[in-house]
Design a protein with these regions (language model features):
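Active-site microenvironment for binding and transforming phosphate-containing groups
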Residues: 1-264
Length: 264
């Protein structure tokens, strides 16, 4: 299990050796945006030049072997809705996504699916044997609302088996930087039915540092995934803010990166 950095023509992305499908966790490198959005910004609602975002998006779609209007994407609301998508859900770039969903599942070949992040946990899942994939935006609210449980349920409805699912979680804000009040660890405790050993660092000032990726790895194991089939990036988006977009570091003045996967 490992993440490797790939550079294709200047576009830098991360890939998990565990995921048996074409996929990418993008970084800030390899786009055309300028100023505070330099350079690979995929957020279309942050104030960046729309034509720059469009070109950035085209480059990421090309990584997935697709055209700019050939992917299905999330419209994220920090909820637990997971949508099963088909070719009818292909998104016309820069248009409004007509549904709300923080996770996407498909069994259609040649249909890339994509979610967007800037500190939240990006999760890509794949059952290669049964040809089912998922892309999930796991912010803390989506996580504790059990979006991964919804994802695995939708994948299994398409024929996937938990023991065959491989999952990778890309760069996200780490326990080193994810400072929270009591509401977050309390919600995580409930989410995981108390299986939270090693997930929190409680500080003297009353704040708690939370390892959200590790928490979601616990949930995936509870859902039947094998521990050896779960990969976790060691990178923190806030610590590595020059490489990744971080909402907390920039206080909201930032772009977005993507996690994308496709069945070839």
């Amino acid at each position: 299990m490992a993440f490797e950095e790939i550079n294709e023509g200047g576009l830098v992305f991360m890939r998990s050796t565990l995921i048996p499908a074409r996929h990418a966790f993008t970084t800030r490198y390899g786009g055309v945006s300028r100023g505070e959005f330099e350079s690979l910004n995929l957020g279309s609602n942050r104030g960046d030049d729309p034509e720059a975002v469009r070109e950035n998006y085209r480059r990421v779609c090309a990584l997935m072997g697709a055209g700019i209007d050939d992917c299905a994407v999330t419209r994220q609301v920090h909820g637990n809705t997971v949508r099963v998508v088909t070719g009818a859900d292909r998104h016309v770039c820069m248009s409004t996504v007509p549904y709300e969903a923080d996770g996407l599942v498909t069994n259609e070949r040649g249909l890339p699916i994509m979610c967007f992040i800037a500190d939240c946990v990006p999760a890509l899942l794949c059952d290669r044997e049964h040809s089912v994939i998922a892309a999930v935006h796991c912010g803390w609210r989506s996580s504790v609302a059990d979006i991964l449980g919804e994802t695995v349920k939708k994948m299994c409805a398409l024929g996937a088996k938990p023991e065959n699912i491989h999952a990778a979680m890309g760069a996200a804000i780490g326990r080193c930087c994810f400072e929270t009040d009591d509401d977050v660890p309390e919600a995580v405790e409930k989410y995981l039915s108390g299986e939270t050993a090693g997930l929190f660092d409680r500080r003297a000032d009353g704040k708690t540092m939370v390892d959200l990726r590790a928490a979601n790895a616990v949930r995936l194991r509870q859902l039947g995934l094998k521990a050896e089939n779960i990969d976790i990036s060691p990178e923190c988006t806030m610590c590595s803010h020059e490489k990744y977009w971080s909402h907390r570091y920039t206080k909201g003045r930032r772009g977005s990166q993507a996690a994308a996967i496709v069945l070839d």
